[in-house]
Amino acid sequence: MKTEMIRVYGIVQGVGFRPFVSREASDLGLCGTVANKGSYVEIHAQGSEKAVGELKNALENRPPERAMIMEIISAHADEPPFDSFEIIDSEKEKGDIFVSPDIAVCEKCKVELFDKTNRRYLHPFINCTQCGPRLTIMDSMPYDRVRTTMADFPMCKDCEREYTDPATRRYDAQPVCCNKCGPEVYIIGSEKKGAEAITATKEAVMAGKIIAVKGIGGFHLCCDAKNESAVKRLRELKNRPAKPLAVMLKDISAARRECDFGEVQEKLLTGWQKPIVLLDKKTSGSLCKSVAPDNPTVGVMLPYAPLHLLLFDYDDGVEMTDSLVMTSGNVRGAPICRSDEDALCEIAGFCDLILSHNRRILIRSDDTVMDTFEGKPYIIRRSRGYAPLPIMTSCGDKGQTLAIGGELKNTFCIRKGSLYYLSSYVGDMADIRTVKALEESVKRMCELLEATPQNVVCDMHPKYNTVAFAEGLDLPLKKVQHHYAHILSCMAENDYSEKVIGVSYDGTGFGTDGTIWGGEILLCDRTGFERMGSIKPFMQVGGDLSSKEGWRIATMIAGSAYGESGGEICEKLGICTAKEYKLLSIMAEKKVNAVSSTSAGRLFDAASAVLGIRRFSTFEGEASMALQFAAEKFSREPFGIYEPMEKLTAEKEGRIMLCTQALIKRLCQGMQNGEDKNRLSYEFHSLLADMTAQACRTISERTGVKVCALSGGVFQNKLLLKMVKCRLEKMGLRVLIHSLVPANDGGIALGQAFYLNEE
């Protein structure tokens, strides 16, 4: 007879871990206890050496599906004899905290939901140890019902019996509930509740109405994705003329009908996180054009909450569409609504009916958006199902840091030692409501993770709201340059701490020289960077308008490339009028609302304008995306199909310059010659990749650094990503890219937290 104390660290709370341990131990004839300690699960296992060994083997090799084991330690324990194996009350201990994300409804709960003989028949909140809300309802750790919003709903006797019975799937399931216990769904401003409310919602959808639906992490706005007039009306109400809308399809069969996808995408669609996955549309699909206009892809997710399943499958005699638009329930720029008060104040004007429920949401959680690249996940927005799973590094860092993140697509990051907890998506910080949401989320996550940051890190921009927030925290503050933070985020995700050649391409960021950066090649390590190369600067004229109207950038670059004949060329190609050219030239010369820029994002906008694809954008990245889609229509091998340009790079004051004026000039010549726009779009991508790779090779030869890191929102363009990566690898360089941390500003906070301040 031996007794061992076993501690298991990782995602072991909220995933049915203690019931799993109890069942395994009992089956092996072991006695003892298992308890949550907040930062780990502690097991006392008493029995034969063989049985204890088999339990440890089960913990290591076949833990519950949703668990993530990071470390197991064990030691001999002197304990009196135990009579049985029990789950005992949780106790708080100091240490690393691992919080489970929200988990999509499992297959067993799906079956029970529609089983008329089951007491949870049609219960919109059915869950078990393998599924249900976690992060969004959690008030503090350890994860027990009394520390969640489910404390508002005392268990009925039947639920309590299952909760305490090791033989059931709901043994120790903290959010366990049923139709007796609550919560319940209802239509705001109506007497309709429960099944009646769901039927009324379905009827409204089929009548072409727009509905607000409260889910796990906040509200969605939804309508029939096959109803063109309903989708157009939703766009008008949200002032969202062209940005793609996500759709929720009833099941994988509906997804196959609408889209082409492979095994990797199917695993993402059907996995327990249930993100929105970007898929190629089929021409034979039935989704209306307004869902994702002029876009070959559409964001698709499958139902992940029981309420979603009821909307599609509740057999109440109402014929229901199998395709719903599901877009975030928020005012443009504001955070997603999470309460009835939010919904009534902010989105009631966008919808005809609000289907809500009385389970409180403590932490907002938007849907995660996922793409794929080279057979692996390539995340665009990291939120529900993934946050706040920590990014682990082997650096052995000490202390705690709060990183505030970027101004756009904001997330924040809490570092505890070598664990980096990247938050759910917060939003764009221009709106004061989003700043308030950031403040609330930081406070709650610090409490949840028992974090007491010793310092704070933020961006360098003097006018960002995130910077003002960081400066008001009364903590030692360090400001990290935006594009350097991008590269650091890629290094952190890949657990790489040595020097890299970082290619950081995005739309904007405040440079150390006070100009706009965005097309940077940096020599980086964790302690600092050197600007080795960049896009050749151009004038960005018109303030905020210049980030939306690519013709302005095209005019400036073409004018620089052609000199005195620039105005004539621009007018001939329809880039701008003679009057507009003269006005912009004067503004640039006198530096009126004009600033020097090296933005790769604006370069893409300029190329799109020159080719007559998009002169302006109604949402971030619209013109650049249209350029990418045009290029992807031209299917050729990326190497050796164009006559090389005379000069791809130059040097000025020790900095390599990518000759983008020559690149825009090439596009202008192509348009004058009547060449195919798709071919020219592809050539733009190819030549920019050539320039980038050539610059990296030169830097590598000079410094001996053989590793490159690619980050920044422009690398969401998978065509450019593939071209640059392939060229660098052909040169013998190792390339680090993102996977489960966004390349865009949603990953900035991780990079800020990874910065090693040696002061």
Predicted feature residues:
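Intrinsically disordered, low-complexity, mixed-charge
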Residues: 1-175, 179-182
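Internal gly/pro-rich beta-alpha loop/helix module
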Residues: 62, 162, 316, 320-395, ...
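A contiguous, well-structured pocket-lining segment that forms one wall/lid of small-molecule binding clefts
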Residues: 160, 175, 182-184, 406-444, ...
